[in-house]
């Protein structure tokens, strides 16, 4: 946070925008990486998250190889958060955390892959299409959809409901 705040401290009459990149790096090294549950591979991760009721059973819709294809596509983009605030917001509000210690079970790329797989409902080509749009930041679903898709213990996927009401 200190590095992020230094952005507004002018040096030679210019904002220190590079401090934001330093803040993102520091946030990952000092906080995110230390508080993320480590899995040896995707199969171990998916099995754990499904068996412990964090995710719905994606194996009912996809083979492990299909799931792996979507994750591989997303991770191949080598996504990096553009700012400290975006990274902080994702990990504070959207990343899946474990029940006991609040450790992270997902990275941003994992959330993208899971949302894509969920929305495609078994159509791996659609899942890859969605994943491509999301990781390239061409489209961002509404908060409830991005937050809850694919989670076993989730809320609604929409942020509002339209009801028809009579005039009496």
Task: Give residue ranges: language-model regions.
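Extended catalytic cores of very large enzyme megasubunits
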Residues: 1-168
